[in-house]
């Protein structure tokens, strides 16, 4: 049985929610002839540690980035920590670690980053940090001195505030801890994103001499740009993180053998960021049409009902959805919106609740929490509305389509590829337009029925679970065959 190293971030198996979790679980559950080893980088070490995994998941490596200063504090690695600490002398730090750290930082902050050099430095840092203590190296005063020295060489970075510089240093420091992880030898590496957690794949690919596949659901760099523009108010910090992020993404793309975005929109972004077009092949997400299908369910009310299934966070723009319901209420006074989804952003959740209260929509907008039966939730709705400001190829849309529901959604990411010809598209962050779409679908029964039939047919023709899984099986087989041919050729050369 071939082994696959699957690299995630705040996802399977600890976080049983969201589209990437659905995709990961589906992939693992459907490919029982492969053995999976899962690495999940955790932003919070107090994340859920109680979960059920299938037999073909033989190991889960949980890596905390915050809340633990050593990987060994969280997971038992071996009995040699004390020996590694003692080996990590001043000489080792100054003569071995600092030169590599300096080269790494120069590369990630360069507007002309050589991705081959950066990949080589990452591999060398890994080779060093598995032998010594990463904590002593990363927390040595010289490491901070080098970081500040490099910032001061660039006029724009030199004007970063102390707080912003320290935050940047600590975030990078925490993620370099990843390089100290020893990963088992595998036959294929599969990353569910192209971002910091995927740097593990750079050295794991070298150690296992195996192919690497990257599946981006939402293009990490695009979503990072949205975050930086929304939450970073210090201009030098914005530039710092945009340059840093671009170079991290580029080095991950550069070592990949295959990149499988979930939609053409993501493919366009990846090409614009420097990914080799010959490596890219779109594989759309697929939905289980045996589970998600039109069905009769009990409804609590006969009121015109709009449903959304989404996390309550800024990227789903639930505030826009609430505002749209307020506009739609003028045309359909008894309209109601049921929002199914959890939230990890307390401030944004409170903002949503305040918006409902300020607009006096308590009788029209209800937060239902998460659901384990989304197929029933979709079938309770008259229509589905999605207000996101960024998406990849969202499961919530194809699941709704599979349930034979008409959808109105913001035209972002791969949403158009799903809804074209069978739903309404509106511009993001336009509550007036979203409201108009809702009203149109709710009042025009013929149009709604037309979209319901077209959506159901399109999902069954193009976006089934079977089609998605079969595509990944073919990619795994192709990569394995190519790798076998390489090994055979290498062996023949050695024999000669």
Spans of features found by a protein language model:
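Short alpha-helical donor nucleotide-sugar binding micro-motif in glycosyltransferases
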Residues: 253, 370-371, 377-381
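Glycosyltransferase donor-sugar binding loop
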Residues: 336-350
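Aromatic "clamp/platform" in nucleotide-sugar-dependent glycosyltransferases that forms part
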Residues: 389
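Conserved acidic donor-binding segment of nucleotide-sugar-dependent glycosyltransferases
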Residues: 424-431, 440-445
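Nucleotide-activated donor-binding/catalytic signature segment of Leloir-type glycosyltransferases, i.e.
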Residues: 349-371
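Short hydrophobic beta-strand element within catalytic cores of glycosyltransferases
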Residues: 406-409
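Conserved donor-binding/catalytic core segment of Leloir-type glycosyltransferases
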Residues: 296-327, 338
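Carbohydrate-associated surface elements
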Residues: 265, 286
């Amino acid at each position: 049985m071939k082994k696959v190293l699957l690299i995630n971030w705040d996802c399977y198996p600890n976080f049983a929610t969201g589209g990437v979790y659905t995709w990961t679980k589906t992939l693992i559950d459907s490919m029982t002839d492969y053995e999976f080893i899962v690495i999940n980088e955790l932003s919070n070490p107090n994340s859920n540690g109680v979960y059920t995994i299938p037999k073909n998941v033989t190991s889960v490596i949980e890596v905390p980035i915050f809340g633990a200063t050593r990987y060994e504090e969280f997971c038992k690695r071996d009995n040699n920590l004390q020996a590694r600490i003692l080996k990590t002398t001043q000489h080792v730090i100054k003569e071995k670690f600092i030169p590599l750290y300096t080269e790494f930082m120069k590369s990630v902050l360069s507007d002309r980053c050589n991705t081959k050099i950066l990949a080589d430095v990452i591999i060398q840092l890994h080779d060093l940090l598995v032998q010594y203590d990463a904590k002593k190296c990363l927390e040595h005063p010289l490491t901070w001195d080098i970081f500040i020295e490099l910032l001061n060489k660039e006029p724009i970075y030199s004007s970063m505030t102390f707080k912003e510089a320290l935050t940047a240093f600590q975030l990078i420091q925490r993620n370099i801890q990843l390089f100290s992880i020893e990963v088992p030898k595998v036959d294929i590496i599969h990353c569910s994103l192209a971002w910091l957690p995927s740097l593990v794949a750079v050295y794991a690919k070298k150690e296992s001499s195996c192919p690497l596949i990257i599946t981006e659901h939402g293009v990490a760099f695009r979503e990072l740009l949205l975050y930086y523009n929304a939450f970073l108010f210090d201009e030098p910090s914005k530039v710092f993180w945009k340059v840093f992020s671009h170079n991290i993404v580029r080095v991950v793309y550069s070592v990949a053998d295959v990149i499988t975005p979930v939609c053409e929109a993501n493919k366009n972004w990846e090409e614009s960021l420097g990914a080799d077009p010959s490596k890219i092949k779109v594989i759309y997400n697929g939905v289980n049409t045996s589970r998600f299908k039109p069905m009769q369910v009990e409804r609590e009310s006969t009121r015109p009902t709009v449903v959304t299934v989404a996390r309550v966070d800024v990227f789903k723009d639930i505030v826009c959805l609430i505002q749209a319901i307020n506009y739609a209420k003028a045309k359909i006074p008894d309209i109601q919106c049921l929002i199914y989804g959890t939230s990890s952003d307390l401030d944004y959740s409170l903002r949503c609740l305040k918006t409902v209260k300020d607009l006096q929509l308590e009788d029209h907008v209800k937060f239902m929490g998460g659901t384990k039966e989304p197929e029933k939730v979709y079938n309770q709705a008259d229509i589905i509305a999605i207000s996101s400001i960024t998406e990849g190829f969202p499961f919530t849309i194809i699941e709704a389509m599979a349930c034979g529901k008409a959808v109105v959604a913001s035209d972002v990411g791969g949403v158009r590829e799903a809804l074209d010809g069978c739903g309404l598209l509106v511009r993001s962050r336009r509550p007036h337009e979203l409201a108009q779409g809702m009203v149109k679908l709710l009042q025009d029964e013929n149009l709604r029925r037309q979209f319901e039939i077209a959506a159901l047919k399109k999902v069954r023709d193009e976006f089934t679970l079977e089609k998605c899984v079969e595509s990944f099986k073919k990619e795994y087989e192709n990569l394995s065959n190519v790798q076998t041919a390489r090994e055979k050729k290498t062996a023949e050369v050695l024999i000669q």
